[in-house]
């Protein structure tokens, strides 16, 4: 998630983000996520898309045991934490400035025997991708990463690098603006995309994407 500190006047209706702790129950664990809206803005609060994607993972929609997963723009790390609790080997990523905060949440919410399953690592989309092996991950996770149009090209480049032909991408988002739909159109040029879940209460969609078979494009 991008780091955008917000003025108090812009946060009307967002009181839940100002709470220092957000508590959830996933995978038979109580998870307490520390939030810090004033210092780190959107990167340091739990958005509904992260909650819905975590619920979707808990439903067993994808096999996580033995799975190599990466969370992009992790922010507070909720999705990556849940994936690790459910058996995945997870690399939880965000920009350098957010890593200390992210790591503190991951370490606070994973039991010692599960902590080796979660690695916090720096990743700025489109930069230094060589630090990750091409097609390294079985599953790529992103919650509310589609909102800054200037990042779309870098995000697509990053997805393309991290995916193999068999990798699955799960993106959870709320379609707020036309630009959000525009990203999905851009995604469809490189990936086969389908909507696999919708939470009407939180108005969050989950999209599944996989690299297009070259034969499909002939």
From Swiss-Prot:
Gene Ontology molecular functions: ATPase binding; Hsp70 protein binding; protein-lysine N-methyltransferase activity
Known function: Protein-lysine methyltransferase that selectively trimethylates residues in heat shock protein 70 (HSP70) family members. Contributes to the in vivo trimethylation of Lys residues in HSPA1 and HSPA8. In vitro methylates 'Lys-561' in HSPA1, 'Lys-564' in HSPA2, 'Lys-585' in HSPA5, 'Lys-563' in HSPA6 and 'Lys-561' in HSPA8.
Pfam families attached to this UniProt entry: Methyltransf_16
Gene name as annotated: Mettl21A
The EC number(s) this enzyme carries: 2.1.1.-
Catalytic activity: L-lysyl-[protein] + 3 S-adenosyl-L-methionine = N(6),N(6),N(6)-trimethyl-L-lysyl-[protein] + 3 S-adenosyl-L-homocysteine + 3 H(+)
The UniProt record lists the keyword Cytoplasm: yes
Keyword flag S-adenosyl-L-methionine: yes
Family the entry assigns: Belongs to the methyltransferase superfamily. METTL21 family.
Keywords: Cytoplasm, Methyltransferase, S-adenosyl-L-methionine, Transferase
Compartments reported by the entry: Cytoplasm
GO cellular component, one term: protein-containing complex
GO biological process: protein methylation
Annotated positions binding S-adenosyl-L-methionine: 47, 73-75, 94, 125, 143
Protein name (record): Protein N-lysine methyltransferase METTL21A
InterPro entries (UniProt xref): Methyltransf_16, SAM-dependent_MTases_sf
Quaternary structure and partners: Interacts with heat shock 70 family members; at least some of these proteins are methylation substrates.
């Amino acid at each position: 998630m991008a780091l955008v500190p917000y003025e108090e006047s812009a946060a009307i209706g967002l009181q839940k983000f100002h709470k220092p702790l957000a508590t959830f129950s996933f995978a038979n664990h109580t998870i307490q996520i520390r939030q810090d809206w004033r210092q780190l803005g959107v990167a340091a609060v739990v958005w509904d898309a992260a909650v819905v994607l975590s619920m979707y993972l808990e439903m067993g929609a994808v096999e996580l045991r033995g799975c190599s997963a990466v969370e992009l723009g992790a922010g507070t790390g909720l999705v990556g934490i849940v994936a690790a609790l459910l058996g995945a080997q997870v690399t939880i990523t965000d920009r350098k400035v957010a890593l200390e905060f992210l790591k503190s949440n991951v370490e606070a919410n994973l039991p010692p025997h599960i902590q080796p399953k979660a690695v916090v690592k720096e990743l700025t989309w489109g930069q230094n991708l060589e630090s990750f092996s091409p097609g390294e991950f079985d599953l790529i996770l992103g919650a509310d990463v589609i909102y800054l149009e200037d990042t779309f090209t870098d995000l697509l480049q990053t997805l393309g690098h991290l995916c193999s032909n068999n990798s699955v991408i799960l993106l959870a988002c709320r379609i707020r603006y036309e630009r959000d739909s525009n990203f999905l159109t851009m995604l469809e040029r490189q990936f086969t995309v389908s909507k696999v879940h919708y939470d009407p209460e939180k108005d969050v969609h989950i999209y599944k994407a996989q690299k297009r078979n070259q034969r499909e494009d002939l």
